[in-house]
Amino acid sequence: MGKEIIIRDLTVSYGGNGNQLEHISLDIAAGEVIVMTGPSGSGKSSLTRVINGLIPYFYEGELSGEVFVDGKPLKEIPSWERGKIVGNVFQDPRSQFFANEVAGEVAFGCENYGYSHEEIRNHVHRAAADIKIQDILDHSLHSLSYGMRQKVAIASAEAIDPEIYVMDEPSANLDIASTYRFADIIRDLKQQGKTIIIAEHRLYYLMDLADRFLCVQKGKIVREFTAQQMKALTNQEIQTLGLRTPDLHQIERTEILSAATSEVILEVKNL
């Protein structure tokens, strides 16, 4: 089962550049799927970095307020223990890879925690089966598509069996088909009762998965929506909030129109 997260009066700033987050208070229930969305630079990524403990320990920043995980202050949880509680999936999975081959990457966290050889093998094969990457365990990470790399990143996190998953724009480099396959993985994690926090611009693939959508602007949570409320927003309301449309059909129509009307900038003949 996932873990409850409580945030109280959280403010984050980076080196005198103003507050990136301002007085955020938020309750996330165990097993809830939360999507944080909003314009670039609004503070979504900073909020994920606080939840997973990267601020202030990896990213230098001044932090005030409190974050609790299952009632325990996050700052009192040692970094090695946080790594077992929170699994991370980033926009570019290559930024979190430490191995050259898939099996080694999935096993990396288990090895760090001193699991026995038998335990590592069991955890790797369970995670690979859950994420459906059994047939590429012996492949080089460098030979994989973005979609497959993202699967490996999730399998690597799942091998340790965390109760919380934090994902920062995980679909950014995926096409539509790969994005929906990624959504199936999130659905499986949700069914397992995991707590999932996703910072994301693309919303269409999360409409049937998210329990709540939080709109972040200028470091503050300004609006909160259920999926039904999100679907009911007009195009004008979506634009005012700085969001992308959650309607895939509208996205596809826009892409088709853009392709049909694009100006030719390079033409080669008889090369």
Ranges and model annotations:
Residues 200-201:
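H-loop/switch region of ABC-family ATPase nucleotide-binding domains
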Residues 66-81:
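ABC ATPase NBD Q-loop/coupling interface
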Residues 1-7, 12-23, 55-60, 78:
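A short, flexible loop at the N-terminus of ABC-type nucleotide-binding domains that lies
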